[in-house]
Regions:
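Short catalytic/metal-binding and nucleic-acid-binding patches
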Residues: 1-132
């Protein structure tokens, strides 16, 4: 999360979230790592009663478009996702090779239907527009 910015949490708010792998290294380059992340994403969705409107997992970063959890904050949900995945991936493939994630993440409140459409389009186009 960006330092110094005030966060506004509202139960009806949609959030566009981006977080990156440590040093922007392409750590999602193998199917087992990708599949493990999808399992953790589903765990987060259930635990926090989130609606995931869209997501994309790129080789070195992730974008999510989600609602504000009814009984927690987006920060709580992202923390849970990143921590639970990091613990599981360490035991699966990393074998103590250090951090998986950058420490912070980007969270933008989606203010209206037009911005929602733009952000969802960005999520859908990200794999196509990147050099992958």
């Amino acid at each position: 999360m960006t330092r110094g910015l005030r966060r506004f949490h509202h139960s009806a708010q949609t959030h566009f979230i981006t977080f990156s792998c440590y040093r922007r290294e392409p750590r999602f380059s193998s199917p087992p790592v990708y599949d493990l992340f999808l399992g953790c994403l589903e765990d987060m969705r259930r635990r926090f009663s989130l609606c995931i409107y869209g997501y994309v997992v790129m080789p070195e970063h992730v974008h999510l478009l989600v609602n504000e959890p009814p009984c927690a904050t987006v920060a709580d949900a992202v923390h849970y996702l990143k921590l639970s995945f990091a613990k599981r991936v360490q035991s699966l493939v990393m074998a103590g090779s250090g951090s998986f994630w950058q420490k912070r993440y980007y969270d933008r409140n989606v203010r209206d239907a037009e911005e929602f459409k733009v952000k969802l389009g960005y999520v859908h186009r990200n794999p196509v527009s990147g050099d992958w």
